[in-house]
Design a protein with these regions (language model features):
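Substrate-binding cleft of secreted/luminal carbohydrate-active enzymes
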Residues: 218, 572-592, 600-771
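Active-site-adjacent "subsite" loops/lids of carbohydrate-active enzymes
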Residues: 320-324, 332, 399-464
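Glycoside hydrolase catalytic-domain groove-lining segments
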Residues: 490-612
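C-terminal low-complexity, Ser/Thr- and acidic/Pro-rich disordered "stalk" regions positioned immediately N-terminal
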Residues: 773-820
Length: 847
């Protein structure tokens, strides 16, 4: 917990103001901080202390002020500054849309000034003179609100009472504070339950910042309906009441875990609760005996941290689970990749989703005539280095590819990009241009030629790199707002052929054809998902297919034309990553878990890059994911995960048990799931009388028998059925549910492996395949090898020939056209015989 440098004399004025920088004309200026000891995101102001490390590790797009242990500024300028002992660094980033914090530092902070921060109110204060820090630590915060029980609009602050209904009815784009009996009892979320003896304060936009900055658990709260003001008070009484209330929630939470037979370290948790209660009781006694407010508040902060750890530890810690990060590679050599992968492994990560295309290029070696060329700043095969390093450390390597978003027209090396070479393949907005505010060059999903080329390129990758999963990102249109995309001749033609409106669609949401125009574009994206699924099943069925999607169904379909519900219904995906960056996505994750069933794992994308979240919030969200049925988490992104120290916080709580990824070794994963099930029986169910000792022995023996049959990622059907019958016979519903949940996690793995085997049998026998293209060919006469001249080999060929023109549109044909008809007939006959044999075997097994 950071040292408090509180400014009570200023707080009365500051807390009445909107949380924006105050004009710089005064001798004292104050600004809101975005975070502490975390990744400096776009437009952020971050404070870095010694706890973060020796340096700030920031890039060149900001400026920093170094503050000594006496709170005096010793230097202003640069980035990646050393953090002084006993001092801190204030780091600002510049953004046109998110905040100009570099400019704020340059205008307001000078060598010799005094700087103080308050991590409770998230305020930074700069003064030309030192400020007396001996005053009280408490404060009041008051703000006008927009109304009682009204619809929450943009930047609104609304008070909801029980006369509104059971919940606030708000969407996911806000933040809410619940007040019960005049006391703040919960923070965060949306569509919150409204207590009969209290109210909910609901914020959107800039009002969210105000609530997050000034309101904390335990504060007293009231509102004046006639004046339309809400007031929160932080004082000794509210701190005492709040801490006592928080501590009292822990024993019931632990008791509830016991009743549901959660697999926890109950003796450890009970001891931690007792220690936290004693620490608070001692601090309270000292405060009542003329102790200082500051010392009392500081100890309460320590207790709050301990409570957060305890709460997050009241969560399952599975031994088979995705603990993944997205990574944009920046390493200059395979050796650096190895070191980085190991660092992530040691921080609790078991899967890396490495970005395959950015900076107008790709990270793998490609044929000379390919429309995708390796990023010129890399002189080695980055993808191969990540595959090798991940497998060396027992981690899955997923290739994260942006599908429709292929480049940036204003970026470096744009002339090497597929969008530059094939502008006719780009998606256009209603104005007939491919341009959008993010400068994303997006492929038109309705263009069949483009789709075929992309799928052929992905086949080339899958044939030549031992990736564990192919991940579809930007598998959608550019998000609809003032601009809408998909207005191409290819799309118009196909739309008319399907719907026969006799008009060319325009951006008119009230048009008679609008719903069909949306549906049509969703179908074009869906066709790409289907094509990739079919290609993988034919070429390397053991490769998983995943997709990164908008976290809400409505947001995906209405604004991005992304119909992932259909993809789940068709069983095309093995993993779905809802990008739940922020808070309040619990209902959406539960809905997607239900939609996915046992055929697809939900692995939630969490926004560790967001300064307002931090390690504690990542732990809470990971625990919530467990509760909601997700099969793990994927953090965006790797560097932020490491800088935010999320790893140590997670490994102390939700990730306290080491976990293997599900599909690197499916046999080992299934056995680990079954061992976890046995552990729950031995350590929880029998001791807490969920089942008898005899039942425990019988079920454990059945589990052991099933483990012996695990092979090729599957379990023996008869023994699995026998175990299910034994679980069904358990009389206690909660005990039965706990064990069935464990077995279900093992069965989810088998569902994917059955699909793999099915496609190996019925897909690969269809036609003989040509030799996989070698991305590392031996140099021909007069050519240099890739090792000697990697940069040259990645450049597009400048020769013009009919063969190369054909290659530009088809990349490489994966099928060998040189096979004789006799060979094909023989292979087809063999395929028919084998398929018949498989059907007979399956029928006999069912009998």
């Amino acid at each position: 917990m950071h040292l408090k440098r509180l400014l009570p004399a200023l707080l009365a004025v500051i807390l009445l103001a909107v949380s924006l920088p105050i004009a710089a004309s005064a001798e004292v200026v104050t600004v809101k901080i975005n975070g502490f000891d975390c990744f400096r995101n776009s437009g952020n102001l971050i404070v870095y202390t010694e706890a973060y490390g020796p340096k700030t590790n920031t890039n060149e797009w900001g400026v920093e002020a170094v503050v000594g242990p006496d709170n005096k500024v010793v230097s202003v300028g640069g980035n990646d500054n050393a953090i002084p002992a006993g001092g801190f660094v204030v780091s600002g980033h510049e953004s046109d849309t998110d905040g100009k914090m570099r400019t704020w530092i340059q205008q307001n902070v000078h060598v010799g000034d005094y700087v103080y921060y308050n991590d409770r109110t998230m305020l930074l204060t700069v003064s030309t003179e030192p400020i007396d820090m001996s005053a009280e630590v408490f404060y009041d915060a008051e703000r006008a609100f927009n109304g009682v029980n009204v619809t929450r609009g943009e930047n609104f602050l609304v008070v909801y009472t029980s006369s509104k209904g059971k919940t606030t009815g708000t969407n996911e784009f806000g933040y809410e504070v619940t007040v019960e009996d005049g006391l703040v009892v919960s923070l965060g979320g949306n569509d919150t339950a409204i207590p009969k003896n209290g109210f909910v304060v609901s914020a959107h936009g800039s009002s969210i910042d105000w609530l997050k900055t000034y309101v904390q658990l335990g504060m007293t709260a009231s509102y004046d309906a006639s004046a339309k003001t809400v007031k929160f008070s932080y004082n000794a009484e509210s701190l005492e009441r709040g801490m006592a209330a928080i501590l009292e929630t822990l024993p019931p939470a632990l008791e509830d875990a016991k009743e549901n037979f959660m697999y926890l370290q109950y003796d450890v948790l009970e001891q931690q609760i007792a220690e936290a209660k004693k620490l608070f009781a001692d601090a309270l006694a000292a405060h009542r005996n003329d102790g200082s407010d500051r010392e009392f508040a500081t100890v309460c902060d320590v207790v709050t941290d301990k409570v957060a750890v305890i709460r997050s530890s009241i969560s399952e810690s599975y031994t088979v689970q995705y603990r993944a990060v997205w990574v944009r590679p920046s390493q200059k050599s395979a050796k650096e990749v190895d070191a980085y992968v190991k660092e992530l492994h040691d921080a609790g990560i078991n899967t890396i989703c490495v970005e395959g295309n950015f900076n107008n290029g790709v990270i793998m070696n490609t044929p000379k005539d390919c429309l995708f060329q390796r990023i010129k700043t890399f002189n080695y095969d980055v993808l191969q280095a990540y595959v090798d390093a991940c497998h060396k450390y027992g981690m899955e390597c997923h290739l994260w590819m942006a599908i429709m978003e292929v480049g940036h027209s204003k970026g470096q090396y744009y002339s090497d990009n597929i969008a530059y070479k094939k502008p006719e393949w780009l998606s256009l907005n209603q104005n007939g241009t491919p341009h959008n505010p993010d400068d994303f060059m997006m492929i038109d999903p309705a263009n069949d030629e483009a789709r075929e080329y992309l799928v052929n390129f992905y086949e080339y990758i899958i044939r030549n790199y031992d990736i564990d999963c192919f991940e579809l990102d930007y598998i959608r249109y550019y998000s609809r707002s003032d601009l809408d995309f998909g207005y191409t001749e290819a799309a118009f033609k196909k739309f008319e052929e399907q719907y026969h409106y006799g008009v060319t669609p325009t951006y008119d949401t009230k048009a008679a054809y609008w719903e069909d125009w949306k549906k049509f574009r969703m179908s074009q994206v869906t066709e790409m998902v289907k094509a990739v699924r079919e290609m993988i099943d034919r070429v390397r069925p053991e490769v998983l297919l995943s997709a990164d999607v908008v976290a809400t169904v409505n947001g995906a379909t209405e604004y991005n034309y992304q119909d992932f519900v259909t993809w789940l219904e068709k069983d095309w995906l093995d993993i779905l990553h809802p990008m739940a960056y922020g808070d309040g996505y619990g209902d959406d994750i539960r809905q997607q878990v239900k939609l996915a069933g046992d055929q697809c794992m939900i692995v939630t994308g969490l926004g560790v890059f967001m300064a307002e979240l931090g390690a504690t919030e990542m732990v809470r969200q990971a625990a919530e994911d467990n509760q909601n049925g997700a099969y793990g988490d994927c953090f965006f992104e790797g560097s932020a995960y490491l800088k935010d120290m999320a790893g140590p916080a997670l490994m102390e709580t939700v990730y306290r048990n080491q976990a293997i990824s599900p599909f690197l070794d499916p046999n080992a994963s299934i056995k680990a799931c079954l061992d976890y099930m046995k552990g729950r029986i031995k350590d929880v169910l029998v001791p807490f009388e969920g089942i008898t000792a005899d039942e425990g022995e019988k079920i454990s023996a059945l589990i052991d028998g099933l483990k012996e049959t695990v092979s090729q990622g599957k379990m023996d059907g008869e023994k699995l059925k026998e175990l299910h019958m034994a679980l069904k016979a358990i009389s206690g519903k909660k005990a039965k549910a706990a064990l069935e949940s464990d077995l279900y996690r093992a069965e989810q793995i088998t569902c994917v492996t059955y699909r793999v085997d099915q496609n190996k049998l019925y897909g690969e026998l269809a036609l003989p395949k040509g030799e996989p293209f070698d991305p590392h060919p031996a140099p021909g006469p007069g050519e240099t090898s890739k090792d000697e001249d990697d940069e040259e080999s990645s450049k597009p060929s400048e020769e013009s020939s009919q063969e190369e023109s054909t290659a530009e549109s088809t990349l490489i044909d994966p099928v060998d056209d040189g096979g004789s008809s006799t060979t094909i007939i023989i292979v087809l006959c063999v395929a028919v015989v084998l398929a018949g044999a498989v059907v007979v075997i399956l029928v006999l097994r069912k009998k």
